[in-house]
């Protein structure tokens, strides 16, 4: 019993350093919000302007890697000896469910406004050209390219899971073929894991920072409760308590049911917006946007704007590529886990087609609705953002639909469930990554999960206190830098090991 307790306890070398680092950064930020904003702006400017090109080349190189997997020597290799664990339909549905987070609802509803009001390529703000390119840029940033990079890492983790039979809970476990067991399990591996965990903590905190205002703004619209930072903090605290109760009472089945409800409700809400907003316009706009995407794709891939220095690629392309980089390991581990028994080609094609369809549907329906509301002067988004913030503007794009009360109730429930499952996933992932050993069928310790959910909640509150999107963008970009190198090392380790051990 003593030995079992030791194995399932925390791993100090990857538990305390991220806890201390993140705690100190939060304390310094709260101590002087104005000074923190100055530092945030400086970090954002440095990383995006000096290293933005690296993120763009990373995505392009990983895209070539995807083609190598699909048409190369490993295309027909099977990831495990068992038949696929899930049917193809269930598999794609699970991938769709992973896309319908509250943060996705946040960006899907408002992103197009920023592209139209501050467009790329020197276009005039709010011009016809800017509107024609608006959705096309969303399709680029949330389309096949990033999902192709995820599929490469998913193949890598699935290979380590099901072919090499490795128990991977931290990225250092995959680096043995690249740097050797001594370094992978020593100081180097510990540093890699700590980079991963610190970045992941901030990424999850930013997702919570995006999701919470949507729920509190819904509460203001539905119940007349004023939206304040204190209300945001109360809501986050309630989610943490609810998560703790679910874990303590063994209600994980309930959380899984909530995830299914979230997916079905997402389909229902998107279908409603599609029908009442203007199905014909949405399909025409999508078709035109695909053409614009194909026409501008080379420029989008390598757009850094070094001459005009308008800031668009730094604020959006580099930000989103960092977003994809920072979530790559966590998402790839999940996608690998549900892909047992599939071939490399199946996984790569299934991910790119299934997940691209999911994100394109979300962005097309929500973005088109927002554009229609802007064109018809039904809502004044710049005024709403200036007076009340971005979350209120998003809420008004939903409230402007027919049967507004029923629509808002649906959106409120969707955001609430999405954030409950987000907090649960955050605490589970971080607890798994900071424990010595958690075997199949076991849960990480309750107190560890609660502790991480509290810390993620604190980060969300701190980012909300700073105000605006820049702190959230900076947290993602700064966290994406170390993960950029970690992802490359995992990729190289897979390639090296597969060449030696994955032969006919």
Curated annotation (Swiss-Prot):
The keyword Cell membrane applies. One of its GO terms (cellular component) is plasma membrane. Pathway: Amine and polyamine metabolism; carnitine metabolism. InterPro entries: BCCT_CS, BCCT_transptr, BCCT_transptr_CaiT. Keywords: Antiport, Cell inner membrane, Cell membrane, Membrane, Transmembrane, Transmembrane helix, Transport. The chain crosses the membrane at residues 10-30, 51-71, 92-112, 143-163, 195-215, 231-251, 263-283, 316-336, 347-367, 398-418, 446-466, 475-495. One of its GO terms (molecular function) is (R)-carnitine:4-(trimethylammonio)butanoate antiporter activity. It catalyses: 4-(trimethylamino)butanoate(in) + (R)-carnitine(out) = 4-(trimethylamino)butanoate(out) + (R)-carnitine(in). The keyword Transport applies. It is found in: Cell inner membrane. Catalyzes the exchange of L-carnitine for gamma-butyrobetaine. NCBIfam families: bcct, PRK03356.1. PANTHER family: HIGH-AFFINITY CHOLINE TRANSPORT PROTEIN-RELATED, L-CARNITINE_GAMMA-BUTYROBETAINE ANTIPORTER. Belongs to the BCCT transporter (TC 2.A.15) family. CaiT subfamily. Homotrimer. This is L-carnitine/gamma-butyrobetaine antiporter. It comes from Escherichia coli O157:H7.
